[in-house]
Amino acid sequence: MLAVGLAAQAQTPIWDTSGNSNLNGIYYFRQVFYFLGDASGDLGEATAIYGNIKFDGNGGYTLTQSTTQPWVYYDSYYGGYTANQTGTYSISASGYGFISSPNPRYPGDYIYGLVSQQGIFVGSSTENTNGYNDMFVAAPLASPMPTAANFSGTYVFSDLDLVGAAQGQPAGMLSMMFTLTADGACHFGTTTVTGYAGTTTTPYTQISTLPTCSFSNGAAVVTFPTNGLLTQGQKYLYFSKDGNFVFGGSPYTGYNPWDMIVGVKVSSGTPNFSDLYYQAGIDELGGYLDTFYGSLDLPALHPQTIMEHQRIEDLFYTPAATDSTYLDSYTLTSGATYSTSLARYAVGAGGAIRIGSGIGPNLGLSVALQAPTLTPTGVFLNPQGIVNAASWAPFTAGIAPGELLTFSNSSNLAADTVVATSPFPTSLDQVQVSIGGLPAPIYYVSPTQISVIVPYAVTGPIADIQVTNNGVLSNTVPVYVNQTSPGVFTQTSNGLGYGATEHNADGSIVTAANPAVIGETVAVYVTGLGAVSPTIADGAPGPTSTLSEVPAGSVTAYIGSATIAPVQATVVYAGLAPALSGLYQIDITIPAGLTAGDNYLYISGPDAYNSQSLIPISTATSAAETPAVAPVPTLGKQPPGRLKVDPKAKRAPSPRGGGGTPKQ
C-alpha cells in the first residue's frame, strides 16, 4: 500500500476568493478514490464518499445528513465510517479553485477544479502526495427537490465500474455507456448497455429491462438486474438544478460501491457544441490509472477542432502532477455523439455538457461542462484568456519562467496598441504587469490584449497576475507555476497546423513542399521551457555567443503519425533562441522509422507536455550534417495577435496515444 496513514495538515494555498459565491447552498456530491497497491499498477484500495454538502458562499462547507441520504465514507480496506463534517474552499472569478478534502484520512489535501456555468464543480486532488487518484463532482440541489416527474426524456450515461478495487486488478475494471428513456413516472423499458472490460478491445453488450425507480430526497434510485454482465444493482442518481446533468454511483451497500456515473439529457437536432468548457475525468489505460481536471476550447473559427488541457495525476509513472495540452477533433452525428480512437462521447443540454466513456483497452470516464461567461468591469484581466502565446492552450495550463504569455479577450488594459523593441521593458504606454509580485517584461499592449514574458525568478506553486493601466489596477488572477510549459509556435500563429520549424542547413521554413528529411537537424521554435544557464535579464534577447541552455535532458521530443507510434528524436540543443526575446529553440534530428507526410510533434519538459503541432516528413535520408544552432529566424517579428485562419490539423492524438489521420 502506498499510503495508509493520516496525512500531515497542509497549508492552505493562497488563492483569489472573489468567486466563492459561485458555490452556495446544498449540493449533492460524490468523490471516488483509487489507490495503487503495487509496482504493477494493481489497485490496493478504493474509497467512495457521497451525500449532501452545504456551501456557505463564503469559503466554508458542512456535510449535512438525512436519514435516507447520509454523507458516507466507505473504503474497500477499512470499511465504512463518516467523512469530515466541515471544510473550506476558495474559488476565483473564473470558477477555478479548490475544496479541502472531506476524506478524514487526508484532511490536508485539496480537490482542484472548476465551477461551470451551471454551478457544477468538477475536479481532482491532483496535487496530493498520499498516493491516490480521485474524481469529485458536486451539483446544486434543485428546490423543490426533483421527483419522478423531473426524470423525463432521454439520457445518455457513462459508467466506470472499478470492480478491480475489490479484486486488486485493473483487469476487473469496466467502462460502459447506456441510454435511459424515462417517462416521468420512473418507467424505462429496455436499455442496452455497451462497454469494455479490462484490457480487452472487444465490446460487450448487456440488454436489461429495468423495474420502476424510486426517489428519495431528490435522488433517483435505479436498480439494474443482479445478473448484469456490465452493470448491476442499485445506482443513486443526482440531478442538476435544470435536470440536464445527472451523476452518482452505487451505494456503499451495493455490488460495487466505488463506481462513478455521469449522464446528460439529450434531444433531437445538433447541439451548439462550442466555446470553453471545464472538465474532469478518470482514465485506466493499459493497466494504470490517472485522473485529471482542466479545460477545453472549441474555437469558433476552427470547426471540429478541440484544444484541450488536462492537469493529470498519473501515479504509476510520475508521482507529481503534470500538464498536458493537445488537440482533438470531432464530427457530431445526428444523435449528438462522436468517437475517437480512445473514447465515445455524447453532447447534450443544448451543447452545454459532454460526457465520455473509454474504448477498450483505454477505459475511462469524463465530463465537460460549459464555462461561465465573465462580465468585465474597469481594467479587466480575463482569467480565461491567459494563454501560452505559442500554443494558445486553454487557460488552466500552468505558466513557466521565461514563457511568453498572451492575455486576450480582456478590456481596458491599455489606451493604445504599442509594440516594444527588444529588450522588452517592464512599462509600456503606462501599462505594467506583475506576475508573482515581480515586474514582467512587456512585448506589446492593446486595449484588449497584452503579451508578456514570465520573469525567470517567479516561483510556485501559485502566482498572481495583475495589470496596471495608468495607475488603475486590474483584478488579480491566480495561476499555477510549473518548471516548464512548452508551446510550439505555428506558421499560422494560432497553435494549430505546421510548427514554426526551420531546416538547419539553410534556415528555410519546413513546409509540405519543403519537408524535413530523415537524419537532418531542424530547429523548432517554442516558448515555456523554463530556467536557462547562463541566466539572462528578464526581457533580454537570447545571447548569440555563449548560448543559454535549459538543463541537459530536461526537454524531450517525439515525432509520430496516426499509424506509427511516436519515435524519440535526438535533442541536439534546447535553450533560448539567439537574438530573440521570449523564444526558445529546440534543435532535433529527425529519426528513422517515420512515415512520409504530416506527423505530430511532441515536446515535453519534466512536468508538462504539448502535442498540438504538425511537422511534414520526407522519408528520404539527408546527407550527414553538423548539428548547430540554426540561423536567427524572422518568426519573432510577426505582429501581435492571433491570425484567423482554418487549422491545418483536423485531428491530433491524445497525449496518451491514439489519434486519427492528420489532414491538410
Locate each region found by the language model.
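N-terminal non-cleavable signal-anchor helices
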Residues: G5, W15, S116, G348, ...
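Sec-dependent, cleavable N-terminal signal peptides
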Residues: M1-Q11, T661-Q664
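Mature soluble binding/inhibitory domains
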Residues: Q9-F380
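A sequence-level detector for low-complexity, Ser/Thr- and acidic-rich stretches
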Residues: F35-G41, G164-A171, S175, A185, ...
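Short intrinsically disordered, low-complexity coil segments enriched in acidic
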Residues: M1-A7, D314, P439, A569
